[in-house]
UniProtKB/Swiss-Prot annotation:
Its EC number is 3.1.3.-. This is Putative nucleotidase OB0422. Keywords: Hydrolase. The keyword 4Fe-4S does not apply. It comes from the Bacteria. It comes from Oceanobacillus iheyensis (strain DSM 14371 / CIP 107618 / JCM 11309 / KCTC 3954 / HTE831). InterPro entries: 5_3-deoxyribonucleotidase-like, HAD-like_sf, HAD_sf, Nucleotidase_putative. The lineage of its organism: Bacteria, Bacillati, Bacillota, Bacilli, Bacillales. SUPFAM superfamilies: HAD-like (SSF56784).
Length: 188
């Protein structure tokens, strides 16, 4: 039996892309999806000609809708997590989502059939605080989309994998998940 840890946003679910479509509707702007797929940073507001402050405000004003509506799950992600659980492995979720949204996030995951134990769900920390939680759990594998998070874990025994995103393609030091369907066959 092994312990698997997963970030949620932009690792298991397409949160930024979901936000992109919400922004298009709210701002009544049509932006080519290819521009989104070429972004070299996490934040998406520049695609809509918003400055940092306006982008932060747009994100905060849209947060409930972004987090708790019909955000798509990456193809194969749910199946991968369910198969790992079925094989007897422990599943942990470690997300930097704010404490205010933790319980609702857990409920959303369950509604979408992700296996979630209360004791295996961690939220409300900053990205740089994830390291302490992940180290304390002594995970065998951890998957995240942010190189800055994974960089803090390179001296641990945890096998680190990065979920492919346009903003992390310059990071070559981690095994990369492009397609969740390939995860079980190729990464273990």
């Amino acid at each position: 039996m092994m312990k698997f840890g997963f970030d949620i946003d932009d690792t298991l679910i397409r949160l930024r892309e979901h936000a992109f479509h919400i922004y298009q509707r709210k701002l009544n702007q049509q932006v080519d999806i290819e521009k989104f797929h070429q972004l070299e940073r996490v934040e998406i507001h520049e695609l809509f000609s918003l400055n940092e402050q306006e982008g932060k405000q747009m994100w905060e004003d849209s947060l409930e809708e972004i987090y708790f509506t019909d955000c798509p799950i990456y193809p194969g992600a749910l199946e991968t997590v369910l198969q790992l659980e079925e094989l007897g492995h422990e599943i942990y979720y470690i997300t930097a989502r704010p404490k205010l949204h933790g319980e609702q996030t857990k409920a959303w995951l369950r509604q979408n059939e992700f296996p979630v134990l209360d004791s295996h769900f961690f939220y409300g920390m900053k990205d740089n605080e994830k390291m302490e939680i992940i180290q304390g759990l002594d995970l065998d594998y951890y998957v995240d989309d942010k190189p800055t998070v994974l960089d803090t874990l390179t001296k641990t025994n945890t096998k680190l994998l990065i979920k492919d995103q346009s903003y992390n393609r310059n990071k070559k030091s981690f095994a990369r998940i492009i397609d969740w369907h390939d995860f079980l066959q190729n990464k273990l």
